[in-house]
């Protein structure tokens, strides 16, 4: 509760894979003791990380902090650059990412919990329509984050609208957030998102799927309302 008392509204979790697994207290303690002795195996690490993702979701049901999950980046791909200059020098590369099975333990436990808000991101666009949109359509706790990192672009946003919205529905997405450390880019990024949102909505109006009043209301939500709701800023 300390972070919430200081104004935090969300947590953010990075993982190579969105793997989750429920372990018993005895299993957790055994792995932890092996880790303290520097004897943990790769399988121990995978299981412990998966269990901790479940624990993070559980804690979010208690403190109400929105849980964000950003998986699928293989960090420091070029080992020579990493050795010479250290981490985070531009060699973080997307990987193929599986969500349906990896997240099943977490979603079985908390996917319908009224106090969990889980926002998922991806660097694997092939999962938009195959996995993420269907998952967001059935688990009330789950929303899809906006196009992230390499896809935070004109074409990336266009693909997102085409692949996500039909199955997930607009209101199972989290709008657009300021997921960047490059603060000077924030106005430009929001400008691109709002223009692409308007373009997508205009296409729906032109095909008589929406009327103008509906499109105007949805445009306001895509610009601001969805994000405020997803991150519980008005609560």
Language model regions located:
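Acidic (Asp/Glu)-rich catalytic clusters
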Residues: 1-7, 107-111, 134-139, 164-169
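Extended recognition/assembly regions associated with phosphoester-bond processing machinery
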Residues: 1-6, 50, 58-63, 206, ...
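Short, well-ordered coil/turn segments that N-cap beta-strands
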Residues: 5-9, 63-65, 114-117, 140-143, ...
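Divalent metal-binding pocket/active-site signature
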Residues: 9-127
């Amino acid at each position: 509760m300390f972070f919430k008392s200081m104004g935090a509204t969300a947590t953010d979790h990075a993982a190579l894979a969105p793997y989750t697994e429920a372990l018993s207290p005895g299993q957790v303690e055994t792995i932890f003791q092996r880790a303290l002795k520097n004897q943990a195996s790769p399988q121990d690490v995978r299981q412990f990380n998966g269990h901790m993702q479940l624990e993070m979701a559980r804690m979010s049901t208690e403190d109400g902090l929105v849980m964000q999950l950003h998986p699928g980046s293989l960090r420091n791909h070029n080992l020579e650059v990493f050795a010479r200059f250290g981490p985070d020098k531009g060699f973080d590369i997307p990987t193929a990412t599986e969500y349906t099975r990896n997240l099943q333990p977490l979603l079985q436990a908390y996917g319908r919990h009224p106090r969990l808000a889980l926002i998922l991101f991806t660097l694997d666009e092939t999962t938009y329509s195959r996995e993420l949109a269907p998952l967001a359509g059935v688990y009330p706790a789950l929303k899809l984050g906006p196009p992230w990192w390499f896809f935070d672009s004109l074409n990336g946003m266009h693909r997102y609208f085409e692949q996500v919205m039909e199955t997930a529905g607009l209101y199972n997405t989290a709008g657009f957030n300021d997921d960047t450390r490059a603060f000077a880019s924030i106005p430009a990024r929001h400008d691109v998102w709002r223009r692409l949102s308007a373009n997508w909505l205009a296409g729906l109006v032109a095909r008589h799927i929406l009327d103008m009043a509906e499109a105007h209301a949805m445009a306001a939500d895509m610009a601001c309302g969805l994000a405020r709701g997803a991150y519980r800023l008005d609560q």
